[in-house]
Regions:
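Conserved strand-to-helix beginnings and helix N-cap segments that scaffold or border functional pockets
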Residues: 20-21, 69, 129-132
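Generic beta-structure capping elements
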Residues: 37, 59-61, 107, 156
Length: 201
């Protein structure tokens, strides 16, 4: 049967988080759109992670180890202490479904300077904000222990859960579910454990 006009777009840079950077929504001219991505038959997703990155910088004091008593501050050890303050069950290897996490992606360290690079992910906005607050409070605790400015945390939000924008327009999701049923496919709503270009648009 007849249908409304369709628009199809390709975003080649989705996997590196830049697929939506040059996407001209006005020129695309659609009232709403769906992303077609890999997954199992019947998967329908309209929720993704809230995402942030965190860079933790630890400043130490390097002194000759032979005369280091009461004056050396080893940034690497404080970095390890910071990481140890984060819950062990909130790591990617211990989570699934709607469970969020903090993931240590990279670390570099010497006695004088150490850096930890994390990504923070959670579907729930309040839980997402609490995860970021934990980074701040861990740093505050260590600064109280070792001196102001020892630990710095730089947090940056990357993208948000598109569910917040979609929920007022659930007819879009229901239309997709009905289309799947019409094609003999049982829709299964699952959360995206990642991001998507749609969340950035």
């Amino acid at each position: 049967g007849a249908h409304a006009s369709l628009r199809i777009g390709f975003t080649p840079d989705e996997e590196i988080g830049r697929g939506a950077d040059r996407f001209d929504l006005a020129h695309f001219g659609a009232d709403y759109a769906y992303t077609v991505d890999g997954g199992t038959l019947g998967e329908l997703e309209y929720e993704n992670f809230n995402a942030a990155s965190a860079v933790v910088t630890v400043h130490g004091r390097n002194v000759h180890p032979g005369s280091a008593k009461r004056c050396m501050i080893n940034a690497q050890l404080i970095a390890m202490e910071f990481h140890g303050m984060l819950p062990v069950h909130d790591r990617p290897e211990a989570t699934e479904g709607y469970e969020g996490f903090s993931h240590l992606c990279a670390m570099q360290g010497e006695v004088e300077l150490a850096t930890l690079e994390y990504i923070i992910r959670d579907h729930d906005r309040a839980s997402f904000e609490a995860r970021k607050a934990l980074f701040e409070s861990a740093a505050a605790f260590l600064n109280a222990k070792y001196g102001a400015g020892t630990v710095e945390v730089a947090l940056r939000d990357s993208y948000y859960n598109m569910r917040e924008k979609i929920e007022p327009h659930m007819a879009i999701v229901e239309a997709a579910q009905q289309a799947m049923r019409d094609a003999g496919v049982t829709p299964r709503v699952v959360p995206i454990r990642g991001g998507t270009d749609g969340a950035r648009l």
